[in-house]
Amino acid sequence: MTQPQMAPICLVENHNEQLSVNQEAIEILDKISQPVVVVAIVGWSHTGKSYLMNCLAGQNHVSGTLPTSQRFPSGLHRAVSDQGHLDVVHAPPHQARALVLLDTEGLGDVEKGDPKNDLWIFALSVLLSSTFVYNSMNTINHQALEQLHYVTELTELIRAKSSPNPHGIKNSTEFVSFFPDFVWTVRDFMLELKLNGEDITSDEYLENALKLIPGNNPRIQASNSARECIRRFFPNRKCFVFEWPTHDIELIKQLETISEDQLDPTFKESAMAFASYIFTYAKIKTLREGIKVTGNGLGTLVTTYVDAINSGAVPCLDDAVTTLAQRENSVAVQKAASHYSEQMAQRLSLPTDTIQELLDVHAACEKEAMAVFMEHSFKDENQQFLKKLVELLREKNGLFLLKNEEASDKYCQEELDRLSKDLMDNISTFSVPGGHRLYMDMREKIEHDYWQVPRKGVKASEVFQNFLQSQAIIESSILQADTALTAGQKAIAEKHTKKEAAEKEQDLLRQKQKEHQEYMEAQEKRNKENLEQLRRKLEQEREQLIKDHNMMLEKLTKEQKTFREEGYKTQAEELRREIHQLGHNIKEMKQNGDSLVESILRSWFSFISPPSESEKAISSVLSLLRKKDRL
């Protein structure tokens, strides 16, 4: 069943030469927890780019159906579509990813007034998208490339790193690492796809159009500058050409109202190919080091970038990623902690029979919670959020240990009260000759029955020990009043009682020692498992970083080779230097990666190893036990 359309919502608008983010759009993005594929469509006014947006949004109409600048303030518009349908809808929770469409108001619109508006909207589209679609008319020629002068200003509008390059060099590798794929769509294409009399594909047409043209003419230099920037910043390129939607002049005048079957079949075929490519190959928005952006993460990015622009700064990827990491890692801590609490509550039946039973469940739930955090966190500098999680899990584990003790204490006390009720109700009947033996028989039966009660928990011995201590004065009174016993027999009985009490106290202390040993062994095992989880994550991040750098190296090497073959030695040499530096960085990552990981792991182990206050308290119990053993 087709879901109802969701109207486009303005994401970024320009009021009085000041960009602002629409909070309604941010609230919608915040609800999208899946990774997002972000497609931005940019082009000059009245070039038909809205039709492309409609193709992706599932509207079978031609340009004009999306709001124009007369109806919406200038800026980006967003719509969300799931990957399974072309209807513009909220992304369902079960979808693995969501599609976010960013439609810009037309570039060069004189009604917008602010000349910088186009520059910033162009830059934001590049920063936010994973696929950047540039739409133009007729052909890719000098004029079309001159109109794309915005791409030559990206290095002035965007920074990759918080600290500038120490040599002041604008390194294209910094941008290649996070720039989107580039798709050029040409509407009302007027040429045949031929080169030197041979048929060529639209992609080959684009690559030929991006070849540098010899000459010092200012127009040639301007178009060459755009060509070079596209080739260096956007190594993944694709092109689609669209012939006229219809050759009927009267129908062209009514493009907004004609039906789909009145469109030229070749035009419809191109539109379907474009939409199919986007839905099949458009990638999830990914930042450096393989960080996948979710809907709520996209909202954080756009807010951070717009805040930077409004403050007079240049949007910086590193700063945005840091802001995003702070938010996402904080959420990851809460997700992991909630998972731990939910799973502990589901799997535990308090009181547990032994402390080991609780520790086993805790270990399993903690391991899962750590995995949840590792999955949803990134760039956790100095493991500050992981430390918060560990402290939170320790606190929660302590609460479960306390609840377990309280449940055991309550249950044991209730059972002991039930079993000893007859004894306590008839205590006066033992003040007779031979009463001490009768009292001891009944108490021994209580003890026997008590230890037959299942799942008393960790407080079973302590509760019974307290019961015996509460009976000590009563037993002594009954013993002294028993005229059937001689003074010597009473002394022997009293000595036996004290010895038995001392032995039970020793048993209780040994039990606490055993529980402490189990706790410490379980903690050590968990620490090793947590350390291994952290090691895997650090190594995966390093491998991803090396993989990303190798991909950049491959793309830049290919582009450098092309420049060299075309005879452009200056551009080839610039890329050679960048390739050399990138190769050096990869070599350093491989050589120093292990030592860096080990350094982080050592620091982490020193954090998780120190004994807690509760462990110190247990140590004092051990000290007391050793003293008693020496007596």
UniProtKB/Swiss-Prot annotation:
Compartments where found: Golgi apparatus membrane; Cytoplasm; Nucleus; Cytoplasm, Perinuclear region
Any single Pfam family the record assigns to this protein: GBP_C
Family per record: Belongs to the TRAFAC class dynamin-like GTPase superfamily. GB1/RHD3 GTPase family. GB1 subfamily.
EC numbers: 3.6.5.-
Classification lineage: Eukaryota, Metazoa, Chordata, Craniata, Vertebrata
Subunit text: Heterodimer with other family members, including GBP1, GBP2 and GBP5. Dimerization regulates subcellular location. Interacts with IRF7; preventing interaction between TRAF6 and IRF7, resulting in impaired TRAF6-mediated IRF7 ubiquitination.
Top-level taxonomic group: Eukaryota
Keyword entries, A-Z: Coiled coil, Cytoplasm, Golgi apparatus, GTP-binding, Hydrolase, Immunity, Innate immunity, Membrane, Nucleotide-binding, Nucleus
Protein name per Swiss-Prot or TrEMBL: Guanylate-binding protein 4
Function: Interferon (IFN)-inducible GTPase that plays important roles in innate immunity against a diverse range of bacterial, viral and protozoan pathogens. Negatively regulates the antiviral response by inhibiting activation of IRF7 transcription factor.
Molecular function in Gene Ontology: GTP binding; GTPase activity; ubiquitin-protein transferase inhibitor activity
